[in-house]
Amino acid sequence: MSSTAPWDQLTWQPSSDQLQQFNRLQELLREWNGKVNLTRLVEGEDYWISQIFDSLWPLQPWLSKGEPLKVIDVGTGGGFPGLAIAIALPQAQLTLVDSVGRKVQAVQAMADALGLTERVQLRCERAEKTGRDPHCRRQFQLAVARAVAAAPVVAEYLVPLLSADGTALLYRGQWSDEDQRQLQRAAAQLNSSTETIQVQELPAERGLRHVIPLRPQGVCPKQYPRAVGVPAKLPLA
Protein backbone atom coordinates (compact mmCIF):
# COMPACT_ATOMS: atom_id res chain seq x y z
CA MET A 1 0.00 0.00 0.00
CA SER A 2 1.02 3.63 -0.31
CA SER A 3 2.86 5.05 2.65
CA THR A 4 0.28 7.87 2.80
CA ALA A 5 -2.81 5.67 2.90
CA PRO A 6 -3.61 5.53 6.64
CA TRP A 7 -3.29 9.23 7.44
CA ASP A 8 -6.73 10.27 6.22
CA GLN A 9 -8.25 8.41 9.18
CA LEU A 10 -6.28 10.41 11.74
CA THR A 11 -6.78 14.00 12.87
CA TRP A 12 -3.04 14.44 12.28
CA GLN A 13 -0.80 14.35 9.22
CA PRO A 14 2.96 13.69 9.22
CA SER A 15 5.30 16.30 7.80
CA SER A 16 7.50 15.32 4.87
CA ASP A 17 10.41 14.85 7.29
CA GLN A 18 8.32 12.61 9.53
CA LEU A 19 7.16 10.57 6.55
CA GLN A 20 10.80 10.13 5.55
CA GLN A 21 11.55 8.91 9.05
CA PHE A 22 8.72 6.38 8.93
CA ASN A 23 10.11 5.09 5.63
CA ARG A 24 13.61 4.98 7.08
CA LEU A 25 12.29 3.10 10.12
CA GLN A 26 10.84 0.47 7.80
CA GLU A 27 14.24 0.07 6.13
CA LEU A 28 15.93 -0.28 9.51
CA LEU A 29 13.33 -2.78 10.64
CA ARG A 30 14.04 -4.92 7.58
CA GLU A 31 17.77 -4.75 8.27
CA TRP A 32 17.56 -5.61 11.96
CA ASN A 33 14.86 -8.22 11.51
CA GLY A 34 17.45 -10.24 9.61
CA LYS A 35 19.66 -10.23 12.71
CA VAL A 36 17.15 -10.30 15.55
CA ASN A 37 13.60 -11.65 15.45
CA LEU A 38 11.83 -8.35 16.11
CA THR A 39 8.49 -8.62 14.30
CA ARG A 40 6.76 -10.17 11.32
CA LEU A 41 4.97 -6.88 10.56
CA VAL A 42 7.51 -5.27 8.26
CA GLU A 43 6.08 -4.99 4.74
CA GLY A 44 3.17 -3.16 3.12
CA GLU A 45 -0.01 -2.97 5.17
CA ASP A 46 1.62 -5.03 7.92
CA TYR A 47 3.93 -2.10 8.54
CA TRP A 48 1.85 0.95 7.65
CA ILE A 49 -1.40 -0.17 9.25
CA SER A 50 -0.59 -2.82 11.86
CA GLN A 51 2.52 -1.04 13.11
CA ILE A 52 2.44 2.70 12.38
CA PHE A 53 -1.29 3.46 12.26
CA ASP A 54 -2.06 1.09 15.14
CA SER A 55 0.66 2.73 17.23
CA LEU A 56 -0.61 6.26 16.63
CA TRP A 57 -4.41 6.26 16.41
CA PRO A 58 -4.87 6.23 20.24
CA LEU A 59 -2.64 9.30 20.57
CA GLN A 60 -4.72 11.72 18.52
CA PRO A 61 -5.36 14.13 21.44
CA TRP A 62 -1.60 14.41 21.98
CA LEU A 63 -0.71 14.47 18.27
CA SER A 64 -2.89 17.52 17.71
CA LYS A 65 -1.30 19.44 20.62
CA GLY A 66 2.39 18.73 19.96
CA GLU A 67 3.32 19.61 23.55
CA PRO A 68 6.47 18.43 25.36
CA LEU A 69 5.76 15.11 27.04
CA LYS A 70 7.56 12.40 28.92
CA VAL A 71 6.40 9.07 27.48
CA ILE A 72 7.25 5.50 28.44
CA ASP A 73 6.63 2.38 26.33
CA VAL A 74 6.70 -0.76 28.46
CA GLY A 75 7.48 -3.98 26.59
CA THR A 76 8.54 -2.17 23.43
CA GLY A 77 9.72 -5.35 21.68
CA GLY A 78 10.70 -4.31 18.18
CA GLY A 79 10.21 -0.64 19.04
CA PHE A 80 6.45 -0.19 18.76
CA PRO A 81 4.62 1.88 19.61
CA GLY A 82 7.61 3.77 21.05
CA LEU A 83 9.61 4.62 17.92
CA ALA A 84 6.48 5.59 16.00
CA ILE A 85 5.50 7.90 18.85
CA ALA A 86 8.99 9.41 18.94
CA ILE A 87 8.72 10.31 15.26
CA ALA A 88 5.17 11.64 15.55
CA LEU A 89 5.81 13.70 18.71
CA PRO A 90 9.05 15.62 18.11
CA GLN A 91 8.75 17.47 21.43
CA ALA A 92 8.50 14.27 23.48
CA GLN A 93 11.15 12.49 25.53
CA LEU A 94 10.68 8.73 25.39
CA THR A 95 11.79 5.81 27.53
CA LEU A 96 11.46 2.37 25.94
CA VAL A 97 11.60 -0.67 28.21
CA ASP A 98 12.14 -4.32 27.32
CA SER A 99 13.74 -7.25 29.12
CA VAL A 100 15.26 -8.87 26.01
CA GLY A 101 18.78 -7.53 25.54
CA ARG A 102 19.11 -8.21 21.81
CA LYS A 103 15.86 -6.39 21.09
CA VAL A 104 16.92 -3.43 23.20
CA GLN A 105 20.23 -3.23 21.32
CA ALA A 106 18.42 -3.35 17.96
CA VAL A 107 15.88 -0.69 18.93
CA GLN A 108 18.64 1.55 20.29
CA ALA A 109 20.52 1.21 17.00
CA MET A 110 17.38 2.08 15.04
CA ALA A 111 16.70 5.11 17.26
CA ASP A 112 20.28 6.29 16.76
CA ALA A 113 20.05 5.85 12.98
CA LEU A 114 16.84 7.89 12.97
CA GLY A 115 18.54 10.75 14.80
CA LEU A 116 16.50 10.17 17.95
CA THR A 117 19.40 9.56 20.34
CA GLU A 118 18.76 12.72 22.37
CA ARG A 119 15.08 11.95 22.88
CA VAL A 120 14.88 8.15 23.17
CA GLN A 121 16.31 6.21 26.09
CA LEU A 122 16.32 2.40 26.22
CA ARG A 123 16.16 0.40 29.44
CA CYS A 124 16.87 -3.33 29.46
CA GLU A 125 14.97 -4.59 32.49
CA ARG A 126 11.70 -6.02 33.71
CA ALA A 127 8.81 -3.60 34.01
CA GLU A 128 8.51 -4.21 37.74
CA LYS A 129 12.02 -2.80 38.25
CA THR A 130 11.22 0.25 36.14
CA GLY A 131 8.17 1.00 38.27
CA ARG A 132 10.23 0.95 41.46
CA ASP A 133 13.05 3.13 40.15
CA PRO A 134 12.67 6.66 41.57
CA HIS A 135 13.92 8.07 38.25
CA CYS A 136 10.85 6.54 36.57
CA ARG A 137 8.15 6.23 39.21
CA ARG A 138 5.52 8.99 38.87
CA GLN A 139 7.55 10.66 36.11
CA PHE A 140 5.54 10.20 32.89
CA GLN A 141 2.60 12.06 31.40
CA LEU A 142 1.93 9.12 29.08
CA ALA A 143 2.60 5.40 29.61
CA VAL A 144 1.76 2.88 26.89
CA ALA A 145 1.91 -0.88 26.42
CA ARG A 146 0.85 -2.95 23.43
CA ALA A 147 0.39 -6.74 23.45
CA VAL A 148 2.36 -7.22 26.67
CA ALA A 149 0.18 -9.18 29.14
CA ALA A 150 -3.32 -9.41 30.60
CA ALA A 151 -4.82 -6.00 31.30
CA PRO A 152 -4.60 -6.14 35.14
CA VAL A 153 -0.91 -7.04 34.81
CA VAL A 154 -0.26 -4.18 32.41
CA ALA A 155 -2.09 -1.77 34.71
CA GLU A 156 0.24 -2.75 37.55
CA TYR A 157 3.21 -2.04 35.28
CA LEU A 158 1.99 1.33 34.02
CA VAL A 159 0.09 3.14 36.77
CA PRO A 160 3.09 3.51 39.15
CA LEU A 161 4.93 5.30 36.34
CA LEU A 162 2.30 8.02 35.89
CA SER A 163 2.63 11.60 37.03
CA ALA A 164 -0.36 13.06 38.85
CA ASP A 165 -1.81 14.30 35.54
CA GLY A 166 -0.67 11.28 33.52
CA THR A 167 -2.55 8.78 31.39
CA ALA A 168 -1.85 5.11 30.76
CA LEU A 169 -3.00 3.64 27.45
CA LEU A 170 -3.58 -0.10 27.31
CA TYR A 171 -3.58 -1.23 23.67
CA ARG A 172 -5.83 -4.27 23.23
CA GLY A 173 -7.43 -6.25 20.42
CA GLN A 174 -10.77 -7.64 21.51
CA TRP A 175 -12.27 -6.33 24.73
CA SER A 176 -15.20 -7.73 26.72
CA ASP A 177 -17.34 -6.58 29.63
CA GLU A 178 -15.54 -9.13 31.82
CA ASP A 179 -12.18 -7.72 30.73
CA GLN A 180 -13.42 -4.30 31.77
CA ARG A 181 -14.61 -5.53 35.18
CA GLN A 182 -11.28 -7.22 35.87
CA LEU A 183 -9.35 -4.11 34.89
CA GLN A 184 -11.55 -1.85 37.01
CA ARG A 185 -10.93 -4.03 40.07
CA ALA A 186 -7.18 -3.91 39.47
CA ALA A 187 -7.22 -0.18 38.77
CA ALA A 188 -8.97 0.54 42.07
CA GLN A 189 -6.20 -1.24 44.00
CA LEU A 190 -3.66 0.95 42.17
CA ASN A 191 -5.59 4.11 43.14
CA SER A 192 -6.57 4.72 39.52
CA SER A 193 -9.65 4.44 37.34
CA THR A 194 -10.56 3.61 33.77
CA GLU A 195 -11.80 6.25 31.35
CA THR A 196 -13.85 6.03 28.17
CA ILE A 197 -12.75 3.12 26.00
CA GLN A 198 -11.51 4.09 22.54
CA VAL A 199 -12.47 1.81 19.63
CA GLN A 200 -10.96 1.79 16.15
CA GLU A 201 -11.57 -0.40 13.12
CA LEU A 202 -8.18 -0.65 11.44
CA PRO A 203 -8.05 0.16 7.72
CA ALA A 204 -8.05 -2.64 5.14
CA GLU A 205 -10.12 -4.92 7.41
CA ARG A 206 -7.19 -5.40 9.76
CA GLY A 207 -9.43 -5.89 12.76
CA LEU A 208 -10.97 -4.08 15.69
CA ARG A 209 -8.75 -2.40 18.27
CA HIS A 210 -9.52 -1.06 21.73
CA VAL A 211 -7.49 1.29 23.90
CA ILE A 212 -8.37 1.63 27.56
CA PRO A 213 -7.11 4.78 29.29
CA LEU A 214 -6.26 4.77 33.00
CA ARG A 215 -5.84 7.88 35.14
CA PRO A 216 -4.44 8.15 38.68
CA GLN A 217 -6.88 9.11 41.41
CA GLY A 218 -4.05 9.77 43.85
CA VAL A 219 -0.66 8.28 44.64
CA CYS A 220 -0.21 4.64 43.67
CA PRO A 221 0.39 2.52 46.81
CA LYS A 222 4.08 1.85 47.44
CA GLN A 223 3.71 -1.93 47.24
CA TYR A 224 3.02 -1.74 43.50
CA PRO A 225 4.41 -2.97 41.25
CA ARG A 226 5.11 -6.13 43.19
CA ALA A 227 8.32 -8.18 42.81
CA VAL A 228 9.44 -9.36 39.37
CA GLY A 229 7.11 -12.05 38.08
CA VAL A 230 4.43 -11.66 40.74
CA PRO A 231 2.00 -9.45 38.77
CA ALA A 232 1.80 -12.04 35.98
CA LYS A 233 1.56 -15.02 38.34
CA LEU A 234 -0.96 -13.41 40.69
CA PRO A 235 -2.82 -10.68 38.78
CA LEU A 236 -4.70 -8.12 40.82
CA ALA A 237 -8.33 -9.15 41.15
Curated annotation (Swiss-Prot):
Pfam families: GidB
EC primary class: transferase
Gene Ontology molecular function, alphabetical: rRNA (guanine-N7-)-methyltransferase activity
EC number: 2.1.1.-
Cellular compartments per GO CC: cytosol
Keyword entries, A-Z: Cytoplasm, Methyltransferase, rRNA processing, S-adenosyl-L-methionine, Transferase
Subcellular location: Cytoplasm
Transmembrane segments: none
InterPro entries: rRNA_ssu_MeTfrase_G, SAM-dependent_MTases_sf
Superkingdom of origin organism: Bacteria
Annotated positions binding S-adenosyl-L-methionine: 75, 80, 127-128, 146
Function field: Specifically methylates the N7 position of a guanine in 16S rRNA.
Family listed: Belongs to the methyltransferase superfamily. RNA methyltransferase RsmG family.
Name assigned to this protein: Ribosomal RNA small subunit methyltransferase G
Gene: rsmG
